[in-house]
Amino acid sequence: MKYEKLFQPGKIGNLELRNRVVMTAMGALMGDWNGCTTPEQIRFYEDRAKGGCGLIIPEFTSVDADSGHCNPIQLGIYDSRQIKSFQLICEAVHRHGAKIFIQLHHGGREAPPACNGGRQAMAPSMELNSVVGRATILPREMTIEDIDNLVEKYVQAAVNSELAGADGVEVHAAHGYLVQQFLSPYTNKRTDEYGGSMENRCRFLVRILTGIRAAVSRDFVVGARINGNDFVEGGNDLAACTEIAKYLEPYVDYFNVSCGVYASAPTMIEPCYSPEGWRKDLAKTIKAAVHVPVIAVNTIKHPETAERFLQEGVSDFVGMSRMQLADPEVVKKAMAGREDLIRKCLGCMNCNKSVVAGKNLHCAINPVTGRATVYGDENLVKTGAGRTVAVVGGGPGGMQAALLLKKRGYYPVIFESRDHLGGSAVLASKAPCKGMVAELIETMKAEMKEYHIEVRLNTPATVETLRALDPYCVVVACGGDQIVPNIPGVDRSNVYYIEDVLLRRVSFEGKNIAVIGGGHVGLEVAHFLCDNNKVTVVEMQKEVGVTIYRTARYKLLSLLAESGVEVLTEHAIAGVTDGAVELRKTDTGAVVTRPADIVIMALGNRPDKSYEQQLKDAFDKVVFVGDANKGGTMADATLSAYENCWFF
């Protein structure tokens, strides 16, 4: 049997789960301003339960009306409206055979005053928070009365969770939030009974857990999410976290092992530059030291990896959250042996980026995530009646458009001038740490085959070719043309473009290389070239990678710095000569010369407006997706396919 353990039932306390797959908590931010759920949020969790997940732990849920909120629309479980609201989520999850725990949360020093009626954040000690890319918050030190009050509120929140129909609660004691701030010497500088020794630092959490256990029913599950490592100097390392787990074991039914705090944010929610399963030793060590079940999050991207980790004793249950953002049916598809149809998380951080921007939780490769009440299949306008639609371009945007149009009843035909599908994503997949993009292309190709979508490779979409098809509509998803700067020397033999590098048409060793353009692609090309070369990234803006989400940017820039890549900002390319580049300082206009044996242009793409106009002149209905629409990211490509092909 391929999945001997992954789809085997398992128990936490006296509660049996149908399999070992857990959707661990993540900020979905689909609630309302009263801390209550919304139809979109209910649908979000219901779809994952319907997809086969065994246990769902919704996003962090506030225990206090007056403090600890980390977002103005964070869910709460402290009043009667919220209890009734959570009943809807619990009923939806139970309806499809999954179980649900509510994660109890207080932000402590991470709770902005703006989200808490202007009130100052409170924490074990007056220690500034430290966040990658975010301003600091100075909390006040909690009094004993504050501690006593919050213990009561955690206990009441657990009681409310049981009233709402949940199967258990998880106290959030990780990620630099309040309870973890008590646990870690990095943030706990107290000298009373709540600080100093490990036992004292655990006292707040022990009081919460014992209070909850005394207040809820016997079979109601009580667990804790803990760190396996804080990954900050002065914090708890793996050995310390293991001792904490051993000390807390008598008070919990399970542990959910994660890692990191806001000062080490790239370890909490890892971008693609961290390999799958990189943190597995954290959970494995803690599991070996305790006798209660352990859930572990390990940036799982493949069900096969989840099975292997269960076999290796890394954990008893597997957290697969971002995996289920990308594809809510990952469990069903794996059980059916259709792994080829699973859209797997890229680690692109679009989900976190959307939440930080104040939007619903969205996924770059699944535009329905966070938009299911609008773009769910039950809302499809099936007016195609078999009419033909020409889709120009076989990248992710084009394939997404074709898939949607097929579901709407049209007959899409993809025209791709190259001998393969994938478009510019093929280039992206060649950069270091971007293998998941290649897997996405293969998955989308499998979808084209599964839905019997006609694909014409090596077929440029000229006006004449398209006219021969007599299409009802033309969808243009052909991407853009690379930007070539109008400068002296741009046509010299030592000037190359990103496809020359990433497709390995050329290779360099021992060269002084200037990469012109410090956007995402430019930085990744620099990463690609940094072995055995001296690489300099040249960017005209004040910073590089400004469109990259902050934790991914931090991680990528760290990798480049470790590899000796130089970053030169506020300089624009002015010319290329033999063995050098001429750069213009953007502040003074002065031109300086820098040595460069090789020059790589990584300035991005722009839509081909002349081709677009030809199509508009020739056909009545023409819509644009992806780069042909406005340029941008994978998320732009797939979402624009829905936005522009949902109805016409």
Language model feature labels by segment:
Residues 1-392, 396, 400-407, 411-412, ...:
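Flavin-dependent oxidoreductase catalytic cores
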Residues 411-451, 527-571, 629:
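Rossmann-like dinucleotide-binding cores of NAD(P)H-dependent redox enzymes
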